[in-house]
């Protein structure tokens, strides 16, 4: 397997985990629908995601019990599917953010002045 393919796969998996953390972080403040989540993530270029890419992540997070959804009427169109974080999601977010920050700090100390 070529190095670029390995790097690409690693980046894809890394971003999936980051998107889960970002989505849960956004849902801590209020329930949001898919397009609203996508728009909020796009405000930070490193977290920009397409609408088509966010829905499989939301489905997976729902299946894991980290988020749940409900339908609500919209003033300007069909009903919207809102997502909200569960208690399990809150616990998972806290655990993973702590682990992420711990790992991030360790990597920074190892990389020295590389960045």
Swiss-Prot record:
Keywords: DNA-binding. GO terms for molecular function: DNA binding. InterPro entries: Metal_resp_DNA-bind_regulator (IPR052509), Tscrpt_reg_PadR_N (IPR005149), WH-like_DNA-bd_sf (IPR036388), WH_DNA-bd_sf (IPR036390). It comes from the Bacteria. The keyword Plastid does not apply. This is Putative DNA-binding protein YizB. It comes from Bacillus subtilis (strain 168).
């Amino acid at each position: 397997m070529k190095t670029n393919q390995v790097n690409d796969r690693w980046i894809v998996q890394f971003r999936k985990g980051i998107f889960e953390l970002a989505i849960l972080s956004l849902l801590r403040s209020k329930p949001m629908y898919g397009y609203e989540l996508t728009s909020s993530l796009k405000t930070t270029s490193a977290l920009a995601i397409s609408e088509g890419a966010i829905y499989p992540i939301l489905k997976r997070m729902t299946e894991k019990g980290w988020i749940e959804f409900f339908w609500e009427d919209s003033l300007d169109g069909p009903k919207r599917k809102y997502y909200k974080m569960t208690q399990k999601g809150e616990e998972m977010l806290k655990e993973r953010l702590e682990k992420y920050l711990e790992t991030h700090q360790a990597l920074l100390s190892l990389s020295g002045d590389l960045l």
